[in-house]
Amino acid sequence: MNPDFTGKWKANIENSRLLGPAPKELLITISHSEPDLRVNMAITTVDQNTRYIDFQARTTGESATNSVLDAAWRSRLRWMGSELLIESWANQSEHELHFCDYWTLSSDRRVLTMEHRNDDLHGQITVLDRVDVDC
């Protein structure tokens, strides 16, 4: 049985390894009812600007296109054992980008880890703590 990532999550910036400037806050709301996944992010920078990202796709491996930061991102989601791989391609600021973001959920369902491997953000790990009460 695959993990259910549904919940409200807050990035633990101190426990994460982020490439580039760290945000002041990263909040993520996930709605996951297999095979549908919907992600809403609110990224607040240190100068208090907040950007919102909405993303939706299916975990069946079919391609989905979302508008992310004013660019079309093509993504494919698939299960790799108990990890969810979100593979995305985008052309951002005239650069072709490739991302392989592996999601894992702790056994107590309180910590979501998003780890980039073998991609343009290789080595970045975002650790998120559950902030909703029901899990």
Region spans (language model):
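Hydrophobic small-molecule pocket/channel-lining residues, especially in calycin-type beta-barrels
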Residues: 1-135
